[in-house]
Amino acid sequence: MQTKTPFFSRLYVQVLIAIALGVTLGALAPDLGAKMKPLGDAFIKLIKMMIAPIIFATVVVGIAKMGDMKEVGRVGVKALFYFEAVTTLALVIGLIVVNLLQPGAGLNIDPHTLHAKDIAKFTAGAKEMNTVDFLLHIIPDTVVGAFASGEILQVLTFSVLLGLALTKMGDNGKTIVHILDEFSHALFGVINMLMKLAPIGAFGAMAFTIGKYGIGSLKQLGFLMACVYLTCFAFVFIVLGAIARFSGFSLWRFLVYIKEEILLVLGTSSSESALPGIMKKLENLGCSKPVVGMVVPTGYSFNLDGTSIYLTMAAIFIAQATNVNLTLGEELAIIGVLLLTSKGAAAVTGGGFITLAATLATLGGKLPVEGLALLIGIDRFMSEARAITNLIGNGVATVVIAKWEKALDVERMRQVLEGSEPPAPPKTKRETMPEPALQTR
């Protein structure tokens, strides 16, 4: 039995206290609050520092762990097709809701006050780019140059190619995959350390926001939080509910079945924390072990439905808050970019924030990366909605793909979801499929 963690030592509580202090300082001493801006800026720079290496490690390992493409390619193709279809739907739903509810309208933030030097740097290099230019820009001149300049799409291009190459290498590539996997763990260790500074960044950003723009801005930020939670709730029960029903099982009963994992995610704000438990339960539900072993870990990089919803809503919120008028074509272009950058989002606390920074950095200065300062104080409180939606989305995806592959014991699933205690699932032909190595923490 674990020792109970003191209430005040939880990051969630510390950020909440920091936000309250920032709001108080900004309201009572606006001039002093506005001077707290460097605290938020410093935290953003620390997060931006980690973007390229984290995307590189997570994407390479995620693709490489799919295993031998010749033998499990059918499952992989179906999984990737499902992931792209559902995450695209999540992005579009987020776009529709944020445009209908307009949570950022009325903030009237001057983007130049967020970080004038960086804004000038982005806008100076912004050019009207046609499709051919955009596609050519995705290809880096050099790999080192892509990392040095922080060109996220170029880093993604190299990462995908390397992941595919390691997959083709088979056993010879496992050492490299293992090293990169451990490297990604180390990177997230750094992120965990940086997230301890989140209260300081939240305090500085909130004090600056309230001091500069008034207490009324807090209402708009709270509205964004409500919009994200509402959209995730609707996505789970309407979209995933329809997918589950079409696939022959009850989403509600499935949620009851994985309630322990949902509560774990609620407490940690990380869907990764429930990965071992959800895999075990999916196997017990009747999904074949090889399908579970391939779909679940791949989904943790490629099927983050909650994160996709958040990314679209947050990006458009920043546009609304800074009075950047986006055309429909530009908003669809953001979705196109997010289809790429969201694949680098890790299912850990802070992953969505990192990916949002990566996305804004690819838009040629149209939206200021420094607009993230508006979200530091509330990002942590939206992570529960994202993480739980990610968890449920990956669980549903695994059951659906297992059924497509005829690797699902339908009768066993029915008994388990109805609360029966059937015997251990029998071995199936699918159990002979090569199972990709999966390391859990």
Swiss-Prot record:
<protein>
    <recommendedName>
        <fullName>C4-dicarboxylate transport protein</fullName>
    </recommendedName>
</protein>
<feature type="transmembrane region" description="Helical">
    <location>
        <begin position="13"/>
        <end position="33"/>
    </location>
</feature>
<feature type="transmembrane region" description="Helical">
    <location>
        <begin position="188"/>
        <end position="208"/>
    </location>
</feature>
<keyword id="KW-0812">Transmembrane</keyword>
<feature type="transmembrane region" description="Helical">
    <location>
        <begin position="334"/>
        <end position="354"/>
    </location>
</feature>
<feature type="transmembrane region" description="Helical">
    <location>
        <begin position="80"/>
        <end position="100"/>
    </location>
</feature>
<dbReference type="GO" id="GO:0015138">
    <property type="term" value="F:fumarate transmembrane transporter activity"/>
</dbReference>
<feature type="transmembrane region" description="Helical">
    <location>
        <begin position="146"/>
        <end position="166"/>
    </location>
</feature>
<dbReference type="InterPro" id="IPR036458">
    <property type="entry name" value="Na:dicarbo_symporter_sf"/>
</dbReference>
<feature type="transmembrane region" description="Helical">
    <location>
        <begin position="309"/>
        <end position="329"/>
    </location>
</feature>
<keyword id="KW-1003">Cell membrane</keyword>
<dbReference type="GO" id="GO:0015366">
    <property type="term" value="F:malate:proton symporter activity"/>
</dbReference>
<dbReference type="Pfam" id="PF00375">
    <property type="entry name" value="SDF"/>
</dbReference>
<dbReference type="InterPro" id="IPR001991">
    <property type="entry name" value="Na-dicarboxylate_symporter"/>
</dbReference>
<feature type="region of interest" description="Disordered">
    <location>
        <begin position="416"/>
        <end position="441"/>
    </location>
</feature>
<keyword id="KW-0472">Membrane</keyword>
<dbReference type="InterPro" id="IPR023954">
    <property type="entry name" value="C4_dicarb_transport"/>
</dbReference>
<dbReference type="GO" id="GO:0015141">
    <property type="term" value="F:succinate transmembrane transporter activity"/>
</dbReference>
<keyword id="KW-0997">Cell inner membrane</keyword>
<keyword id="KW-0813">Transport</keyword>
<keyword id="KW-0769">Symport</keyword>
<feature type="transmembrane region" description="Helical">
    <location>
        <begin position="43"/>
        <end position="63"/>
    </location>
</feature>
<dbReference type="GO" id="GO:0005886">
    <property type="term" value="C:plasma membrane"/>
</dbReference>
<feature type="transmembrane region" description="Helical">
    <location>
        <begin position="223"/>
        <end position="243"/>
    </location>
</feature>
<comment type="similarity">
    <text>Belongs to the dicarboxylate/amino acid:cation symporter (DAACS) (TC 2.A.23) family.</text>
</comment>
<keyword id="KW-1133">Transmembrane helix</keyword>
<comment type="function">
    <text>Responsible for the transport of dicarboxylates such as succinate, fumarate, and malate from the periplasm across the membrane.</text>
</comment>
<dbReference type="GO" id="GO:0070778">
    <property type="term" value="P:L-aspartate transmembrane transport"/>
</dbReference>
<dbReference type="InterPro" id="IPR018107">
    <property type="entry name" value="Na-dicarboxylate_symporter_CS"/>
</dbReference>
